A protein has these predicted regions:
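A short, acidic/glycine-rich surface segment
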Residues: 36-38, 57-63, 127-128
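N-terminal beta-strand motif that seeds the catalytic metal site of vicinal oxygen chelate
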Residues: 1-17, 70-75, 123-128
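Exposed loop/turn and edge beta-strand positions of beta-sandwich/beta-sheet ligand-binding modules
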Residues: 35, 69, 103
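Core segments of cupin and vicinal oxygen chelate
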Residues: 8-50
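Acetyl-CoA-dependent GNAT
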Residues: 31, 53-58, 121-124
């Protein structure tokens, strides 16, 4: 058995997919251009995949009202300040930004739809 994807019911999967491709470096690996507008997005490694869709069989959560510790998608970055600046210029907002005791840094942002994005710059990368 292996992990395949994480799915999120979102209000506008087409616009969100475009934003994630343009600003987070993801790529669309499969999409359906009819309701529920499924878009499968892979990260640069191809190992992590998000499915975005707007399925009216279930409620779309109000992500902006959820605390980011309930659900967030984390991205490792090389240039924390530059990435925060670039994403906020593209419509994201900063929720928190902290330096850890080991020198690593974590920033929590929200994308334009309110979904929490964590930016990580770890002193010791996961899996190292």
């Amino acid at each position: 058995m292996h992990f395949e994807h994480v799915a999120m019911n979102v209000p506008d999967p087409r616009a969100m997919a475009r934003w994630y491709v343009e600003h987070l470096g993801m790529r669309i690996v499969r999409q359906v251009d009819a309701p529920p507008y499924m878009h499968f997005l892979a990260d640069v490694t191809g190992r992590v995949v998000f499915e975005l869709y707007a399925n009216d069989l279930a409620a779309i959560p109000n992500y902006a009202e959820q605390h980011p510790l309930i659900l967030h998608n984390a991205f490792a970055v090389e240039d924390m300040d530059g990435t925060i600046e670039r994403l906020t210029a593209a419509g994201a907002s900063v929720f928190s930004d902290e330096t850890l005791p080991d020198g690593g840094r974590l920033a929590m942002l929200r994308d334009p739809w309110g979904i929490a994005l964590q930016l990580t710059q770890r002193a010791v990368p996961l899996g190292a």
